[in-house]
């Protein structure tokens, strides 16, 4: 019945057999075009400026295209074209200041000519229909004329030159250059994979999401920081307290108030009444005067204690999480704490709101604070839009073009088998474990009430739990970092996965269990910064696990030595991209240098991949089969 209805609906899209034949020819032709370029990036962490720069430059792809398209140009000319494509408005403003009218006219003519040539070069792997869709409507006709005149007989050269000259004469050169730049930026990246962690640490998560919402093709693999926000939206007060504590720690809590309309009044009033300024709780980032440093340290302490109380409540009502070793508030009144066989003194104490008899119970005022934050967060229109976007485009893992993408890890035992997580009498491991968590994340986010339940508790566990595929460590040592001086207690032990992923056998085991060809598939993994300064490589698993961490978070750039790795997969294979820290447009313009370097990482010769070999190709083949069936079995009425 469903199939019959499907074909009835399909018939309505066509008025004749000729239209079906045309569509079949079109789809089968598309299958033979080279596959589009995929771009993989992870761990953006609210760093809008760095991400925006990467996308504007195509992660170095645009410069490579310029090298291939214009081998005769010198490095200065290539750098100028590359910068103008990435930052056309800035480049145009600089030119206007530096050149007179005649020089500017010549520059416009040369730049438009080069940008048309580059656009044509980038468009050569796409159908005309797809190219047309990427053009700005107001200049679509003009750009198409210029694109398809290039390389034609000499008698059209004057026609070509006249179009450009007339655009300059009519004072539309700047507008056209900006339109061409946007078109090139769209063409060099066909699809974006965000391999987790858009939120936290950086202050511009909202701008990151708004930028990504305009991407023409994109997917997410959720990270633990993303699920923290999803959990907060679903009603987990432990998630709410944590994400606001992190915002205070990294100095962007005021940004949440401004951008998302969060009401902070109850929180700030409570914090100033019950906590004293404490330099140990000053924000790690941001430019604040002394009054604000002191105020934020009070807020930071209040949120920290509320978080530990709420986490304790989750741990106590979910014994299957096996996290009793993270219950510390029972002991804090003694001024020391027992970890394993050793006792440690506590420093920076701020436990005055902890009741020795009921350490995990919120006071009435604390409950009012967290209720206010939760209500404000869950009813923010912008947060609703961003959460729904991440849910719609996201998942715990993705199989795309025969590659496996996930953020954190696949929990393993020391022997290399899938580790099991037991919940309500059922055991989950490997692919089933990721599916289990995704089901509860979607259920938690879909419910209309703010009540905490198993779904919201499991979302919190995804953020912090020992067997969470998004976290992958034995413990999150937040308490130890705040209150114990001995740095040995701050270490977070890794799941065996992170050691075993160096082995080819581990890559093959995981790929096989996810139903993929272990010889020709790859794992793309985010979450952990690659410490280049210590000699670490992003290529693991015998070359079949590629670890990317966008490295955009400034908090990690000192330890990694770079601004991270991202990944490109075009029709020829994979290229890994090394990024240096982005210092701003002014610095880039003055230096006229590249902030990225690309390196092909598969040494063996591989056949060039067409769309027919991709996930999209599989869908197009299905459409062709359906149309052929329709053509053979039904007469289309006029």
Swiss-Prot record:
- Name the chemical reaction catalysed here: beta-D-fructose 1,6-bisphosphate + H2O = beta-D-fructose 6-phosphate + phosphate
Q: Which SUPFAM superfamilies match?
A: Metallo-dependent phosphatases (SSF56300)
From which residue to which does any coiled coil extend?
none
Q: Does the keyword Coiled coil apply?
A: no
Q: What are the GO BP annotations of this UniProt entry?
A: gluconeogenesis
Q: Which Pfam families match?
A: FBPase_2
Q: EC annotation?
A: 3.1.3.11
- Name the coenzymes or cofactors required: Mn(2+)
Pathway assignment reads: Carbohydrate biosynthesis; gluconeogenesis
Q: Which UniProt key words apply to this protein?
A: Carbohydrate metabolism, Hydrolase, Manganese
Q: Which GO terms describe its molecular function?
A: fructose 1,6-bisphosphate 1-phosphatase activity
Main EC class the enzyme belongs to: hydrolase
Q: Which family does it belong to?
A: Belongs to the FBPase class 3 family.
Q: Could you tell me what this protein is called?
A: Fructose-1,6-bisphosphatase class 3
Q: Which organism encodes this protein? A: Pediococcus pentosaceus (strain ATCC 25745 / CCUG 21536 / LMG 10740 / 183-1w)
